[in-house]
């Protein structure tokens, strides 16, 4: 088995919220299943399709896709803060291959990755996001304008094509979603100070990030209590998306539009773009089977929370 997939939701609230014990136990079990899958596969490289939450990417320059040649964690929400083990030569070869095959991608020689990318790595490796070689691939999932989902699929397919002939064990990792609408300012309706942050907030004053995080934690508390004025989770939408993942018909992702996603599943549901890229990458390597699926709508985490694993057909 040379390619496999793990897609999972993340939440900065994992260590800052208290869901019912049964829910927490179910999530922990899903994480354990994911760890077992990854340990058995033992990837030599993790291609990490991750979003960002205005910690590393801002409107001063917001690409739809970006491949990191070097990267480090931002440490938001007490997540991993440090250098990641990125094979720069592989990153450079991948970027050129993707460009040569019709997908426009930016590159970064100093990528900052936040909890959205590093949290799954921490969960899988006992808190050490740098435990395995990682190739960080940013997929814009929060900042309009968005490319059509067909472009995300094509980008993921190109990444998969690059690795299809390798003899290395490569794990495609997608992080984010599913339905959720946390308190992230939208540029169109933001205040002047919020717009300034969304554009050039890369080096905020020391008190700014804790204040942002405290607002999110408080919103989660109020949301779980039925008091927060944010969009509810949408389990029906989530399950329909998981159905497409399971079907192997990645072209069906093309029907998802940005406006529909905002209206049905919340402004941050666009994080499923990382899943679309990851599943499309695996499909480029061959037909696949989803081997595990977990889903719960969890208000304490402000997320329709899912974990899936997949491997190429016939490689069980």
Curated annotation (Swiss-Prot):
Keyword Ligase: no
Record's keyword terms, sorted: Aromatic hydrocarbons catabolism, Dioxygenase, Iron, Oxidoreductase
EC number annotated for this UniProt entry: 1.13.11.16
InterPro entries according to UniProt: DHPP/DHXA_dioxygenase, Xdiol_dOase_suB
Segments traversing the membrane: none
CC cofactor: Fe(2+)
Functional pathway: Aromatic compound metabolism; 3-phenylpropanoate degradation
Name listed for the protein in its UniProt record: 2,3-dihydroxyphenylpropionate/2,3-dihydroxicinnamic acid 1,2-dioxygenase
One GO molecular-function entry: ferrous iron binding
Active site: 115 (proton donor), 180 (proton acceptor)
CDD domains listed in its UniProt record: MhpB_like
Species annotation: Rhodococcus rhodochrous
Biological processes per GO annotation: 3-phenylpropionate catabolic process
Pfam families membership: LigB
Subunit text: Homotetramer.
Family classification: Belongs to the LigB/MhpB extradiol dioxygenase family.
């Amino acid at each position: 088995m040379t390619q496999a997939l793990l897609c999972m939701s993340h939440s900065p609230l994992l260590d800052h919220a208290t869901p019912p014990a049964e829910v927490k136990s179910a999530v922990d079990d899903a994480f354990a299943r994911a760890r077992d899958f990854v340990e058995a596969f033992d990837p030599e490289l993790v291609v990490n399709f991750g979003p960002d939450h205005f910690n590393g990417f801002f409107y001063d320059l917001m690409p739809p896709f970006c491949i990191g040649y070097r990267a480090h964690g931002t440490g938001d929400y007490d997540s991993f803060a440090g250098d990641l083990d990125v094979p720069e030569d592989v990153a450079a070869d991948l970027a050129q291959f993707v460009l040569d095959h019709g997908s426009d991608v930016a590159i970064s020689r100093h990528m900052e990755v936040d909890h959205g990318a590093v949290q799954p790595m921490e969960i899988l490796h006992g808190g050490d996001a740098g435990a395995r070689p990682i190739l960080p691939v940013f997929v814009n999932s929060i900042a309009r304008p968005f490319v059509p989902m067909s472009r995300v699929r094509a980008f993921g397919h190109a990444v998969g094509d690059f690795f299809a002939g390798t003899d290395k064990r490569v794990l495609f990792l997608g992080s984010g979603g599913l339905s959720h609408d946390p308190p992230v300012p939208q540029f169109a309706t933001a205040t002047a100070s919020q717009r300034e942050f969304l554009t050039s907030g890369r080096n905020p004053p020391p008190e700014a990030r804790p204040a942002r995080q405290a607002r999110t934690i408080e919103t989660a508390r109020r949301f779980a209590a039925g008091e927060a004025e944010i969009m509810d989770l949408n389990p029906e939408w989530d399950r329909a998306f998981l159905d497409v993942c399971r079907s192997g018909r990645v072209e069906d992702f093309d029907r998802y539009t940005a406006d529909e996603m905002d209206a049905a599943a919340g402004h941050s549901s666009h994080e499923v773009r990382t899943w679309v890229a990851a599943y499309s990458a695996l499909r480029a390597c061959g037909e696949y089977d989803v081997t595990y699926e977990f889903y719960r709508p969890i208000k304490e985490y402000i997320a329709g929370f899912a974990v899936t694993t997949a491997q190429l057909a016939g490689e069980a």
